[in-house]
A protein has these predicted regions:
Chain B
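Intrinsically disordered, low-complexity segments enriched in small residues
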Residues: 1-92, 96-609
Length: 137, 609
C-alpha cells in the first residue's frame, strides 16, 4: 500500500505541506487545519514532519524520549496517532473534530508530497502498515 | 474578504490601548496590501517631516494578500519613517511571523505613540494584550525569544507545543540603543533590517510582537490557486537559480557570479573584482560551514542556510551569511576569512543589526583610516582593509554600543561626515549600498539613485535582466534603456512587496501572468496586468511624494563621487563610470515627473493619489 515516507534530515521547515493540505481539504490556508505539521526545535534548527493517524481517546502509558540529531524529543510529539488526551494536535479549531491523513489523490498522490521541494516527503509502496519504527528520522 | 483578513489593529502605546479597524476594500485594491497599504496609511497619518524616533512617528507591521496563502509568499513589511535615511522605510522579512499574523486574523498592526516602560505585544486571535517587557530589555534576540516562550508556558499556561507556535518579531540591544542600523528580527530566523526600523521600534519602547492564530486565510478560487502553484513550483524548480543555486548554496551562490561580472564591491567600492572571492563563495561556504537549509513559510526555494563555526571553546551557530553580507563585510572590507565574516554576521543577528549597513560602514571606516583621515586613537587600534579580527571586533562594538562602535552605529554617512570626507561614504540617501557595483551594471546606478528607501537591492534589481537575463538579457555596460528597465523593475517590485511575495520567486512570475493569476485566485478581485502595474506605479509615486514632503530633493537622487567620476580600475567594467545624469533625466521624463523629480499634477491625478 502507498505510504508517505518521512526523512526529517531533509526537511527545511518551509511548511508548504501544511499550507497545501489545508488548501486541499478545507479550501483555505490554515496550518491548524492541516493533517501534517512540522515540529521545530527553535535553537536547534531541527524540523520534523508529523502526519496525523487515527484518533485515539485514551492516553498510552509507555512514554518515551527519542534522541534525534543530538536533541531529546518527547516521544509523544512524534507519535503517529492524530490527537489524544496528552496531545492537542490535529484537531480542527472551532469544531474540535479530529483530523486524519486520508492519503489524498486518486490513486493516492498526496498533496504534501507534491509540495515538498526538499524531498523530505516521498511516496513509497510498503507491504504492511508503516509503523513508528519504519520511519526514518 | 478573501486573501486579506480585513482587520487592522491600531495600538496606542502611550495610552496602552488598542483599537480594531476594518480594511477598506477599495484601498486594498488600489494599494494591494503590505508595503503599498502601509505606505498609504503612513502618508495619510503622519507629517513626513516628523522626527523618526519621536512618538509622532508611526510603525506599521504589514502583510499582503498573498502572505501565508501558500505561494512562496511569507513576507511582512515594517513600514515607518526610517531613522537611518529620514525617508520612508519599508523593510521586508520572510520567516513565519507574517503568515502567523494573518492566521491571527489581521493584515496590519499600526503602532502609535511611545510606551512609558518597555512592553511587548501579545496577540492570540482576539486576545490582544500589551505586557511589560522590562525583563526582556537588554537581552539578545535568542534569549528574548527564549524568555518569551518561557513566560508563555509558565505565566500563561501554554503547553510546550503551543508556546512553540507563537512567533516573535523583536529588536535586540541595538534597537534599544537607537542604533541607526538596527533591525527587527523574526524568531532568530529572518530580519527586516534596513533603514533603521529597529531603532524606531526601540524608540517606542516596544521590545517584541508575539503572535499566534487559528484563523484561516480564505481563498477565492482554490482550484485555480492549486494549479497556479503547481506551475510555479515547476518553473522555480526548472530555473537554475531557484532550482539549484539558491537551494544548494543560498544567496552566497552570487559571490562567484557577481565577481566574474566585475560588480563585486571591493575595497569600499574602489574595485569591482575581489581577488579572494574563491575563499568566501558558495562552494567554500557549503564545504566549510553549512549544516542545513531553512525555508520560509510555504517557499520551495529554501535559500536560508543554517551554518556553524567552531572555534576553541565555542561553537557559533546561526543563519547565513547571505550574499550581501559576504559582499559588504567580505569583499568591501577585503576580508577573505569566512569564519570571521560568519562570526560578525552571527553577532549582528544576535544583537539585531543590519549586516549590509554594518559592513558598508566598517569598509568606510577602513578607507578613512588608511587615508589617515580617521585617527587611530579614536578607534583604539590600527584599522586596515583585510583585517578579519578587526571586523569582528568592530561589529561587536557596534552591537554592544561601546567605544568607537557608538560612532559606527550611526551608519557610514554620519561617520564620513564627522571626519570631513563624505565622499567615502558609499550609499544613497544616507543608506549603505548592497553588494552590486553599479559601474558594471548601469541600470543599478539609476535604480539606486532613485530608490525611495535609499540604496537598495530589492527596489529595482535590474541586474537580474542585465546579468542573469530575466526576463531578457541586455548589455550591462550601456545606459540605453536602463531608465525604463529600472522603472519596470521598481513598479513590479512594489507589487511583489505589497502582495507579500518573495522577490526570489521573481524568476517564476515575471511578466508571464503568474503574479496576476495568484492574486486573482487568492483575492478574487480580478486584477489585470495593467491594473497591477498601475498599482505598483501608484505605490512608487506615493513613496516619492512622502520623501519630497520629508525634505528630500533631487539632490539626494545621486551616487557617491567615486562611482560617477572614478573609472572602475579593472575587471569587465574597466574604464566605466555611471553616467547618471543622462539616465536620470530620462527616468524623470518616463516617470512623468518634472525636471526636479516632482510628480506632476497630471501624474498624481492619473494615479488617483
Amino acid at each position: 500500500m502507498p505510504r508517505v515516507k518521512i526523512d526529517s534530515n531533509k526537511c527545511t521547515g518551509c511548511r508548504s505541506c501544511e499550507a497545501i493540505c489545508s488548501l486541499e481539504h478545507f479550501q483555505v490556508v490554515n496550518p491548524l487545519k492541516s493533517r501534517i505539521r512540522i515540529y521545530h526545535e527553535p535553537g536547534q534548527r531541527l524540523y520534523i514532519p508529523i502526519i496525523s493517524g487515527p484518533f485515539t481517546g485514551a492516553q498510552c502509558t509507555n512514554k518515551t524520549v527519542k534522541v534525534i540529531g543530538g536533541v531529546e524529543i518527547d516521544g509523544c510529539v512524534l507519535c503517529p496517532v492524530a490527537s489524544c488526551p496528552s496531545r492537542h494536535l490535529f484537531v480542527e479549531p472551532g469544531s474540535e473534530i479530529p483530523l486524519k491523513c486520508d492519503m489524498c489523490g486518486e490513486p493516492p498522490d498526496p498533496m504534501c508530497v507534491k509540495s515538498c521541494a526538499s524531498g523530505a516527503l516521498t511516496l513509497v509502496e510498503v507491504e504492511k502498515y508503516a509503523t513508528d519504527f519504519e520511519r526514518s528520522y | 474578504m478573501n486573501g486579506w483578513m480585513g482587520k487592522i489593529i491600531r495600538i496606542n502605546l502611550s495610552e496602552g490601548r488598542h483599537f480594531l479597524e476594518s480594511l477598506d476594500p477599495l484601498m486594498a485594491r488600489n494599494f494591494i496590501g503590505g508595503r503599498g497599504l502601509a505606505s498609504k496609511i503612513l502618508f495619510d497619518e503622519i507629517d513626513p517631516a516628523v522626527d523618526p524616533i519621536s512618538p509622532e512617528n508611526k510603525l506599521i507591521f504589514a502583510t499582503g494578500p498573498l502572505t501565508g496563502a501558500g505561494a512562496a509568499a511569507s513576507r511582512f513589511m515594517v513600514v515607518t519613517k526610517g531613522y537611518l535615511t529620514g525617508a520612508i522605510a519599508c523593510s521586508n522579512s520572510g520567516g513565519n511571523f507574517g503568515p502567523e499574523l494573518k492566521f491571527a486574523g489581521y493584515d496590519l498592526i499600526i503602532f502609535e505613540g511611545k510606551a512609558k516602560e518597555p512592553v511587548y505585544l501579545l496577540i492570540e486571535d482576539d486576545h490582544i494584550e500589551i505586557r511589560p517587557a522590562s525583563f526582556l530589555w537588554g537581552k539578545v534576540i535568542p534569549e528574548t525569544v527564549g524568555l518569551i516562550k518561557q513566560e508563555l508556558k509558565e505565566s500563561l499556561g501554554k503547553t510546550d507545543w503551543e508556546a512553540r507556535e507563537f512567533r516573535v518579531a523583536c529588536i535586540g540591544p541595538a534597537g534599544e540603543n537607537l542604533s541607526r542600523i538596527a533591525a527587527v528580527v523574526t524568531d532568530d530566523e529572518r530580519h527586516a533590517a534596513r533603514s533603521g526600523v529597529g531603532a524606531v521600534m526601540g524608540s517606542k519602547n516596544l521590545k517584541a510582537v508575539v503572535v499566534k492564530g487559528s484563523q484561516s486565510i480564505n481563498i477565492d478560487k482554490h482550484d485555480q490557486l492549486k494549479n497556479t502553484l503547481f506551475l510555479l513550483w515547476e518553473k522555480l524548480k526548472e530555473a537554475k537559480s531557484t532550482g539549484y543555486n539558491l537551494p544548494t548554496y543560498g544567496t552566497s551562490a552570487g559571490v562567484s557570479f557577481y565577481n566574474e561580472c566585475g560588480i563585486m564591491p571591493t575595497h569600499n567600492f574602489k574595485y569591482g573584482v575581489f581577488d579572494h572571492a574563491a575563499k568566501i563563495n558558495g562552494e567554500e561556504m557549503k564545504k566549510k560551514i553549512v549544516k542545513g537549509s531553512f525555508g520560509c513559510f510555504s517557499c520551495p526555494i529554501r535559500c536560508g542556510k543554517i551554518t556553524e563555526v567552531k572555534e576553541e571553546g565555542k561553537v557559533w551557530k546561526g543563519m547565513g551569511p547571505e550574499y550581501e553580507t559576504l559582499a559588504l563585510m567580505g569583499a568591501s572590507c577585503e576580508v577573505d576569512d569566512l569564519a570571521a565574516i560568519a562570526k560578525a554576521n552571527y553577532l549582528c543577528d544576535e544583537f539585531g543589526v543590519d549586516t549590509i549597513s554594518a559592513g558598508g560602514t566598517i569598509a568606510c571606516a577602513m578607507e578613512l583610516s588608511e587615508r589617515d583621515y580617521l585617527p587611530e586613537e579614536d578607534i583604539g587600534f590600527k584599522l586596515t582593509f583585510g583585517d578579519g579580527e578587526a571586523l569582528v571586533k568592530l561589529v561587536e562594538m557596534i552591537c554592544k554600543n561601546e567605544g568607537f562602535g557608538k560612532v559606527l552605529a550611526e551608519g557610514g554617512y554620519r561617520l564620513a561626515e564627522k571626519y570631513g570626507h563624505p565622499e567615502f561614504f558609499m550609499g544613497v540617501k544616507k543608506q549603505e549600498f548592497p553588494g552590486y557595483d553599479p559601474r558594471g551594471v548601469k541600470g543599478m546606478g539609476v535604480a539606486y539613485a532613485t530608490s525611495n528607501r535609499g540604496a537598495c537591492h530589492l527596489r529595482g534589481l535590474t541586474s537580474l535582466s542585465e546579468l542573469v537575463g530575466i526576463p531578457e538579457k541586455v548589455d550591462p555596460l550601456t545606459c540605453e534603456g536602463k531608465a525604463l528597465l529600472a522603472i519596470n523593475f521598481q513598479n513590479f517590485a512594489s507589487v511583489i512587496d505589497s502582495s507579500g511575495m518573495c522577490i526570489f520567486a521573481f524568476r517564476g512570475i515575471w511578466q508571464d501572468g503568474t503574479m496576476e493569476a495568484l492574486l486573482n485566485a487568492v483575492t478574487g478581485v480580478g486584477f489585470d496586468s495593467a491594473e497591477m502595474l498601475k498599482a505598483g506605479e501608484r505605490i512608487w509615486n506615493l513613496e516619492r511624494l512622502f520623501n519630497l514632503k520629508a525634505g528630500l530633493t533631487k539632490k539626494t537622487d545621486t551616487l557617491p563621487k567615486r562611482l560617477l567620476e572614478e573609472p572602475s580600475p579593472r575587471g569587465p567594467a574597466k574604464g566605466h563610470v555611471v553616467e547618471l545624469d543622462k539616465m536620470l533625466i530620462e527616468y524623470y521624463e518616463l516617470r512623468g515627473w518634472d525636471q526636479d523629480g516632482v510628480p506632476t499634477e497630471e501624474k498624481i491625478s492619473e494615479l488617483g493619489l
